[in-house]
Amino acid sequence: NVIAKYDPSISQLLHISSYCVIYQYDEDIEDWTKSSYMGPIAVYSRRSIWDNYRDDDIKKLDVQTIVNSEHGEYYRFGLLVLNRAQPENFSLGFLGDKYLKQSEIESDQNLLVEKSDELIIVRDFNGKAFGLWIFDPKDRDYLYQLLMYCIEKLE
């Protein structure tokens, strides 16, 4: 599995699309800027620290603990764009609100996934906004629904 080369914690491949372009929101110009990341995109579940807990035993975390984790052991899901333009790939980890302290959710520190006409918008735990452009609208809609599931906005 190619993804395991980049993330050895992969558990199961959930979705793959043949082509995605990553945009990053530039607050200075208040517009999207095309990045150099483009290629096949994969969404997958990962083995994580949470595999050892029952739902009612989950210890709530602050965002800095998650962001500062050395190997991403807290993320339940991953997204990876295998970059065709350069050797460096684009990746994001996903974790639902139920793992976060309530204060982090109330201060808007949680992950955010939205959909515009052309982009799936993801705000990570660092507050950076990325736009995922997928050519096929049906594939884009499916990926949006899957990412919403990954952050537990859909059951």
Predicted regions and their residues:
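Boundary segments of small protein-protein interaction reader/adaptor domains
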Residues: 1-128, 134-139, 145-154
